[in-house]
Amino acid sequence: MPTGYFSLILHAHLPFVRHPEYPEFLEEDWLFEAITEVYLPLIFIFQSLHEAGAKPRLAMNVSPPLCEMLADELLQTRYTSHLENLIELAVKEEFRTRAESNAFHDVAKMYVESLLASLDLWNNRYKRNLVNAFRELQDEGVLEIITCCATHGFLPLISTHEARRAQIQIAVANYKKHFGRHPRGIWLAECAYEPGVEKLLKEAEIEYFISDTHSILYGDPRPRYGVHAPVVTQNGVAVFARDVETSQQVWSAEIGYPGNDLYREFYRDIGWDADYEYVKPHLHASGERRHLGLKYHRITGRDVPQNRKEPYIPALARDKAAENASHFIGERIKQAIELRETFDGHPPLVVSPYDAELYGHWWYEGPQFIDFFFKKIHFDQREIECITPGDFLDSGLPIQVQQPTASSWGESGYFKVWINENNSWMYPYQHDAERRMTEYANKFAVPGSEFQVPSSQLETRNQKPETRILNQLARELLLAQSSDWAFQIYQGTTVQYSSRRFQSHIQRFNMLAEMLDRGNVDEELLAEIEARDNIFAEIDFSIYAN
């Protein structure tokens, strides 16, 4: 038996952004950047470790909107063009920097090599479908993939029982479609919990969820082992809470590893640094400058201005990632030894949940850190064993019964990020749509029917117009409920886009509802909305009935 258990949990999520009405769209780059910098590197690392005999073990949420985007042919095609454009620029850069700067030339060569490797993985190994790659990793025992709320809806701010239930049940149905099994666990959007949510999870046959630290620490009764063992609610749903120490070592802007001077600087990008005419062929048709992903500078120092940043040296950054991984493991061993003294002879569990996008997008060397971490865990020590929450539940260790408290992992630990003076205007519209959705479901659902996972092969054109409208009403409500819009408005980033997205889904909901009320179907408009917001082909509106 090890001294301690460690559970790395990655949360891979992006809001559903797909704009077939335009030939290209800036916010679709969120997905494309994440594929290049996060998902492809992590999948490749996990598979390489497994094939080399150093099998990693971790949990990962691949959210339903992300699954739907990764499996979408339009977005797959657009990503391929995005990557080919980036490779073309990188090749130009390799030629340009050869004469101008040896330091920058080494970085340009690195980009050419890594991007060409990414294109090969994308086209040839993974056949442009990363959902299948994640599924294979789960089938091979590397990942325990968990689900998330259907569109990352913030459950405590959803007004009706039926709309909350739908966020869970639709997520489960979508998970089954993509991964061919039932999810054991769920990452509640923003780790947002309030008492009663566990009843919805139990109904959906979900065994556990992830919470923030204070959900357990302030629960009733006081947790005997703090956050270093799960608790279980009265109805049997387990709760795994975030460990503070590991969170700070990676997340903290002051002491976290990603802030090291040798790591790549995120904000210096060729899209802004290079001559405009030089990069213009690689910009969108609007010609507006944007991040392109090729960055040549290192952090250098926290207080060093952007124009004083020094050249990025990949070899030094890689060595630092290895050093940080060793330090992280050493700290986990010390932590486990200290905790074990009060744990009645069984190993403590350290749960470390992070946004997956930290590893590769915000922290370029993050995938290297994970690679070194699992190699060193396997080859260099025996005190720490990496497991998933499901593995812990399967161990049969006794778990304390507790009622967790309301919480989220947002600023200050509760709900203010998602409801405040900047975004509170959204909720009357959302809550009205939630109420009306249940009214429509009650009116049109077959009496006595129960929600079943529908066949994903069911063609839209074979459904009755009323059924198509009702299912699209559900999609528009779900997309409006995405917590990403309120979060980005609070953060002050992409405020216009987030506001417009929320408003457009409410507007489409109202237009569709008016069709239903009048009994006059605008076939052309309905087809246009279905083609634009095509998430969850398998959806069944009757889940909203009470």
Predicted regions and their residues:
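Glycine-rich phosphate-binding "P-loop"
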Residues: T147-I170
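Conserved short loop/turn motifs at secondary-structure junctions
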Residues: P183-Y193, D355-Y359, T494
